Amino acid sequence: MSQDISFLKQLLDAAGPSGFEVRAGRVWRTEASTFAGQVDVDATGNSFAGLNVSGSPHVMLAGHIDEIGLQITHVDEEGYLYIAEIGGWDPQVLVGQRVTILGKSAEVPGVIGKKAVHLMTPDDRDKASKTRQLWVDVGASSRDEVVSLGIRVGDPIVLAQSMIHLAGNRIASRAIDNRIGAFIVLEAIRMLSDNLPAARVTAVATAQEEIGQSGGGARASAYQLEPDVAIVVDVTFSTDVPDVEKKELGEHRLGGGPVLSRGSASHNSVFEMLSSVAEEEEIPYTIQASPRSTRTDADGIHLTRGGVPTGLIS
């Protein structure tokens, strides 16, 4: 277990915003190569680990490895960096955060700033911050000094946060969405590697889910693999927190077991199979209604080629 947690921490701490997943992907593939028979990466940045490549049917297990981040859009004459969002952010959480700029030759620390509250009008104090109003300060005094640090427009940025342990055998990390899914699908085939199944099983750490339309890199990976069935592992909302409407989202407690999606991209036969296995193994689970898109890799995978029966576990 300690070895598993060590790998999970290494994976969670690796920088890998959408479109720049190379660091996190390298960590995942290095671990996969210790037991998987076939390890690869494609042009999109999807990483693959396969077992029993001649087996049948072909089962695809997918968890996206990218995280939300930021990207430099402009460097002004005073050396401040202006930013845009990679993926969906609440800009309020960005103010004052320490960040790491993934520069060409080095990782550069910085801090996100905004106009001091003392300088705001009363009306401005009540307004929510917008990302375009924020900047990153790396300590430079000019644009030339920023350039000398190896920083360029387009460089990605992540929060400077490592995984931490919380009470109740829980953890927190900036990249749990969805590095945890990439971890789970790899651990699943690790468990299978000691006693190979009849099926061919491929774990995929997919790229660009946070910014992808209709499945991001998952669509490209499913197109290549042509699986007979796919199971996507992603995160969802825990509703045992304040101010959440259970009538809309359902009742899903942290630690209450997996959440199985039903509807839209989730094939009913795969849902029934997953729920039956959970009941046979006495694994508690809840059901999440997904009448439209799931906003996960399942949306892209299930419509690939002639269609792929897909399940979604959160």
State where each predicted segment sits.
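N-terminal hydrophobic/helix-forming segments and targeting peptides
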Residues: 1-314
